[in-house]
Amino acid sequence: MTAIIDIIGREILDSRGNPTVEVDVHLEDGSFGRAAVPSGASTGAHEAVELRDGGTRYLGKGVERAVDAVNGEIFEAIGGLDAENQIQIDKTMIELDGTSNKSRLGANAILGVSLAIAKAAAEAAGLPLYRYVGGPNAHLLPVPMMNIINGGAHADNPIDFQEFMIMPVGAETLKDAVRMGSEVFHTLKKQLAAEGHNTNVGDEGGFAPGLASAPAALDFIMKSIEKAGYKPGEDMYVALDCASTEFFKDGKYVLEGEGRTLEPGAMAEYLAELAGKYPIISIEDGMAEDDWDGWKALTDLIGNKCQLVGDDLFVTNSARLRDGIKMGVANSILVKVNQIGSLSETLDAVETAHKARYTAVMSHRSGETEDSTIADLAVATNCGQIKTGSLARSDRLAKYNQLIRIEEQLGLQAAYAGRSILRG
């Protein structure tokens, strides 16, 4: 009854107006699943390949080749299979692709099918996606990392680091956490406007003011947290995404906005200095994706008291994560479904992290859609943290709103991760 009888791929647009893949899956019993695939702006060199068409159509960014793969080869290979056999289906698609990075069929094609099948199977089972994937113990609502100031590749301003986020650790519930974040977000907007800064929002809904440095951005955030009625380092903490690979040149970190160039050791010390001065509890991609020595230095310096998240470093890849675990590098993995390209491999990466006592942070991409799958996956995996943008733009709010619904559905079973994520 849960056999796959039809798969329909199509080209839709993401939050940046670029094409992406959407997939519908129909099962024999009438159950249906739909998934849309996200896309990143700053991408790691080791990510699975997002297949684009090239040529002039959509300035080369069309995804008709990936859609053709969904409607053709992939459907031929998995049509008739039982949607409940997620691992077998994902394995079949990966083997059909035949490359190490999904470059033939495209990770965007494979992922769209993988997620849509999980949704259809959940509907067939009469379960919400988080319960279908996570089982009876899926009840932990994640602390949001809310991106309120943008720099780097996500903004046209001098700030070198890509994201400055607030984490409402002191909230009692996820719903309260969203409210607290919204209050700080709107307070920050007023503060920026009062001092003559631009308050337009970027790809992920955060502001992109013309501030000169990371400390300048952090100072603004501290003032906004306090003015909104909260205590930095108690109610609200801060997280950074440095996206350091973007400014790692010839073995050095070139901070153009701050007008200085740092050796890896000095970069690690600079981040440690910021973490000592401000209530920073998480730093993502503090060092470049292949600067393993720099990562080791940073981990040795502050890994016992600060979450050090590997995004470009690990690219949701269990093999790279295992290398990092062996080397004692970082202590957390950012989980982006399209970096690895299937649901099964995503869940494997989270499990690998948890077994090694590394944390996992479920994450969006800068190019998103109204699809809210990652909200369900954050709860399904009990990862306790989610990174899904600011308190603006419906493509970001779709995830927060879904988490609010999930918390309501769980009722007394629901638990907000809150202070449990703090280290040291």
Curated annotation (Swiss-Prot):
Gene3D superfamilies: Enolase-like C-terminal domain (3.20.20.120), Enolase-like, N-terminal domain (3.30.390.10). It is found in: Cytoplasm; Secreted; Cell surface. CDD domains: enolase. Pfam families: Enolase_C, Enolase_N. Its main location: cytoplasm. It catalyses: (2R)-2-phosphoglycerate = phosphoenolpyruvate + H2O. InterPro entries: Enolase (IPR000941), Enolase-like_C_sf (IPR036849), Enolase-like_N (IPR029017), Enolase_C (IPR020810), Enolase_CS (IPR020809), Enolase_N (IPR020811). Mg(2+) binds at D241, E284, D311. Pathway: Carbohydrate degradation; glycolysis; pyruvate from D-glyceraldehyde 3-phosphate: step 4/5. Binds a second Mg(2+) ion via substrate during catalysis. One of its GO terms (biological process) is glycolytic process. Catalyzes the reversible conversion of 2-phosphoglycerate (2-PG) into phosphoenolpyruvate (PEP). It is essential for the degradation of carbohydrates via glycolysis. NCBIfam families: eno. This is Enolase. It comes from Sinorhizobium fredii (strain NBRC 101917 / NGR234). The gene is eno.
